[in-house]
């Protein structure tokens, strides 16, 4: 059963009514097809109205949906011969990050991504998709291996952020993230990054230094969660909706700002409504990206990545915006 989100509540009653009428028609000789058709038309219009006018906070809710597809869901549908690799060769294996070797359309690749759980037990095992330092070091080990064997790297980003616990800090969380940023910038193989859910802070960016960066239509990418921003700016986490409107965290915002390259369309209602179709949409963009990047040599890939990130964070203003005392 797919959980309904807060903004989808107006749809629930209509769907329930349609279901009840269909069941009643099955169990009796009464023909209710015309009434059902009218309700279905009304439902379709309401769905169009809601999903065509999603607010940033609505998209945050979709990105956090408990049934939203994870990295492993996409690996299963997009890649063959996936062999998961474990451990950072230093401390241990962090299950909040999965990664390994696979084939994509016959091409050997390295695929890495954050991994949330599907239920409480798995979320605890995977630390709710919030990696420890050993997770990032595992990812870096796989990236360096990919460079050695000249395999393209594909990263799926989906985390609230790096785990901020005491043990993680003791084992060098900030150093692990910084090291990934530094090393990814200089890798001589193509890197394609796709934000599939939440892209939270440095924990997301540690897998996000790519030649091409794409986002699913209802994913988010930001330096902090809306709740965290609201707590800092206004001392009230309940103002998260207001923060989401202000922070420019949606795919549309980030495409306009030049942070990402392409928005991957989602099925109506979110990726969790049809995982196979969503994987097919990702497949189209991923094929296109790799086709472009595989034409470039290592030096060009590094330079392109450098130029891309150099542009992020620049701003422009007109003479009228300058106030002179």
Curated annotation (Swiss-Prot):
This is Acetyl-coenzyme A carboxylase carboxyl transferase subunit alpha. Its EC number is 2.1.3.15. PROSITE patterns: COA_CT_CTER. Acetyl-CoA carboxylase is a heterohexamer composed of biotin carboxyl carrier protein (AccB), biotin carboxylase (AccC) and two subunits each of ACCase subunit alpha (AccA) and ACCase subunit beta (AccD). It comes from the Bacteria. It comes from Geobacillus sp. (strain WCH70). GO terms for molecular function: acetyl-CoA carboxylase activity; ATP binding; carboxyl- or carbamoyltransferase activity. Keywords: ATP-binding, Cytoplasm, Fatty acid biosynthesis, Fatty acid metabolism, Lipid biosynthesis, Lipid metabolism, Nucleotide-binding, Transferase. Its main location: cytoplasm.
């Amino acid at each position: 059963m797919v959980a309904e989100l807060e903004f989808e509540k107006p749809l629930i009653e209509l769907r329930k009514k349609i279901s009840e009428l269909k069941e009643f028609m099955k169990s009796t000789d009464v023909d209710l097809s015309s009434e059902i058709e009218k309700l279905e038309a009304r439902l379709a219009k309401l769905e169009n109205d809601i999903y065509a006018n999603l607010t940033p906070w609505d998209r945050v809710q979709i990105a956090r949906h408990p049934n939203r597809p994870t990295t492993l869901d996409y690996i299963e549908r997009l890649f063959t011969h996936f062999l998961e690799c474990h451990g950072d060769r230093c401390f241990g294996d962090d299950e909040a990050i999965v990664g390994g070797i696979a084939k994509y359309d016959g091409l050997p690749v390295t695929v890495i991504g954050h991994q949330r759980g599907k239920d409480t037990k798995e979320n605890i095992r995977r630390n709710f998709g919030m990696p420890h330092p050993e997770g990032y070091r595992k990812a870096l080990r796989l990236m360096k291996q990919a460079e050695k064997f000249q395999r393209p790297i594909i990263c799926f980003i989906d985390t609230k952020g790096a785990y901020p616990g005491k043990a993680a800090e003791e084992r060098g969380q900030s150093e692990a993230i910084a090291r990934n940023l530094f090393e990814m910038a200089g890798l001589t193989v193509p890197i394609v990054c796709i934000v599939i859910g939440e892209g939270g802070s440095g924990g997301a960016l540690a897998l996000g230094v790519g030649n091409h960066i794409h986002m699913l239509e209802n994913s988010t990418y930001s330096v902090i969660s809306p709740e965290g921003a609201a707590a800092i700016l206004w001392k009230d986490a309940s103002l998260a909706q207001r923060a989401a409107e202000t922070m420019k965290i949606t795919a549309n915002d980030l495409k306009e700002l030049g942070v990402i390259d392409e928005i991957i369309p989602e099925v109506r209602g979110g990726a969790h409504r049809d995982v196979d179709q969503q994987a097919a949409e990702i497949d189209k963009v991923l094929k296109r990206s790799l086709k472009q990047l595989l034409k470039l040599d290592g030096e060009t890939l590094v330079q392109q990545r450098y130029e891309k990130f150099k542009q992020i964070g620049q701003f422009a203003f007109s003479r009228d915006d300058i106030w002179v005392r």
